[in-house]
Swiss-Prot record:
Its main location: cytoplasm. The gene is rsmJ. It is an enzyme of class 2 (transferase). It comes from Haemophilus influenzae (strain ATCC 51907 / DSM 11121 / KW20 / Rd). This is Ribosomal RNA small subunit methyltransferase J. Coiled coil: none annotated. Belongs to the methyltransferase superfamily. RsmJ family.
Length: 257
């Protein structure tokens, strides 16, 4: 199943990786150079990053599991007490296997992997897939967390969970966090998310995720939603966990959409 073609500026600022190498990598994922795009995928010496060239103050979007907010969250966050950990059913020694079907920048998946869950990632947008792949490859080399991530966090080479076979590719939990339109002028829309949303947009076909998720999940499907969003597929969950700005809708076992 090929990605639909994405046009974006491709730029190399790296002394080691050439523009030709970046173009070749992107071509494998149906990403082509479009010099008129306000978005750019940039290869630096350190990482692959996404920039919105007409709004440089927004900064670059990239995946970093080793430093920054993820390091702080791993060392000082709530761990098993985090809302996402409770939502997927981590309790005592129970560590469910998880498919994160809307991986994005991998943050919730990283939290679960750091606790000890085996997490498989699926990402539908090819640019985000490459950012995630780049971040994982760098993190796998890290002395402190590389071995743990190689064991617990893997990016699957599929675009949609409907490509997975429920008879062999199942997991205890399927986690869904589809992009949802933010309220107009919301102060909560971070700079990084504005760049991300310009690339990805709202997940208009998010409802199509629920049925294959229910078929793959042995124990539960967890759907993260803004507190003002309707239920995915219009389907009432068995129960919900509410946080300050979000809720986790939980569908148990063999529910059907």
């Amino acid at each position: 199943m090929a990605h639909s073609q994405v046009g974006i500026q491709l730029i190399s600022e790296s002394t080691e990786k050439t523009l030709a190498e970046l173009i070749a990598l992107c071509a494998e994922h149906n990403i082509i150079h479009n010099e008129k795009s306000p978005l750019a995928l940039v290869q630096t010496d350190d990482r692959l990053e996404l920039r919105k060239l007409d709004e440089p103050k927004l900064g670059a979007v990239y995946v970093d599991f080793v430093g920054g907010t993820m390091a702080h969250r791993r060392k000082f966050g709530g761990g098993r007490g985090e809302a996402v950990a409770k939502a997927v059913g981590i309790k005592g020694s129970a560590l469910p296997t998880v498919i994160d079907a809307t991986a994005g920048l991998g943050r919730d998946a990283f939290v679960l992997a750091a606790i000890g869950c085996q997490v498989r990632l699926v990402e539908r947008h090819p640019v985000v897939f490459l950012l995630l792949q780049d971040g994982l490859n760098r993190a796998y080399q890290d002395e402190e967390i590389g071995e743990m991530l190689q064991q617990n966090l893997h990016l699957l080479n599929v675009q949609h969970i409907n490509e997975l076979d429920p008879n062999s590719d199942y997991a205890d939990v399927v986690y869904l966090d589809p992009m949802y339109p933010h309220k107009q002028k919301s102060a909560l829309v971070k700079k990084e998310m504005r760049v991300f949303q310009h690339l990805v947009g709202a997940d208009l076909d998010a409802d199509e995720l629920l049925l294959p998720a229910l078929q793959l999940a042995k124990k539960r499907v967890v759907v993260k939603r803004p507190d003002y969003a309707e239920f995915l597929c219009g389907k009432q969950p068995h129960f919900s966990h509410e946080t300050k700005n979000h809720r986790f809708d939980i569908y148990m076992g063999a529910s059907q959409c």
